[in-house]
């Protein structure tokens, strides 16, 4: 793939990219349910052939389900696309002993059909600023049956906080420049069951992928997110070379 084609795919017309003014009661069109024989994860569509998620979501027998609101009742969904994948590519510096560089790209077997229910999200050209409002979206288990797929898609609007504020929530963690924190300090830290690797989309731009949280991000507890803008060269090079 040459650089001109790569640029074109990463800058698709607005009609095919995510509109941040979507309705709160539907699934954000960039959100993907990563279903496996183990625990599920959240993925984000950044290209008709590529999905980004956390590197710890290296899941067995993975299926990628787009356009779904209730994974526990997928037979009643009208706009679902189910695709397989060709390869998973971890960030080369990722280690299972660290929350840093926790990103993975998934190449799909076929190009996704983009429509009103399935769209790509834009990648950042500048970092999210402190106090920017972000939409964090993932699925939750209202019925507390972890042997089934989650039954509730939820979105929460929360703000980017400073490293100083983040350290009030995570006193013993090293918050690096490649990370950002989103949430409310001190937060409630109530236990809940939600699907991991939730994205933080700020002003319509994908700014972060959840790498660690002690609590429940859907209740606005502080989460630590991989800062996407730091990895744009790796993302672009990976897509170009694969």
UniProtKB/Swiss-Prot annotation:
Keyword Glycoprotein applies: yes
Record localization: Secreted
GO cellular component, one term: extracellular space
One GO process term, biological-process aspect: proteolysis
Residues in Peptidase S1 domain copies: 18-240
An example molecular function term from Gene Ontology annotations: serine-type endopeptidase activity
Keyword Repressor: no
Signal peptide: 1-17
Residues that carry a glycan: 157
Keywords: Disulfide bond, Glycoprotein, Secreted, Serine protease homolog, Signal
InterPro entries xref list: Peptidase_S1_PA (IPR009003), Peptidase_S1_PA_chymotrypsin (IPR043504), Trypsin_dom (IPR001254)
Gene3D superfamilies in alphabetical order: Trypsin-like serine proteases
Protein name stated in the entry: Probable inactive serine protease 58
Species whose genome carries this gene: Bos taurus (Bovine)
Gene behind this protein: PRSS58
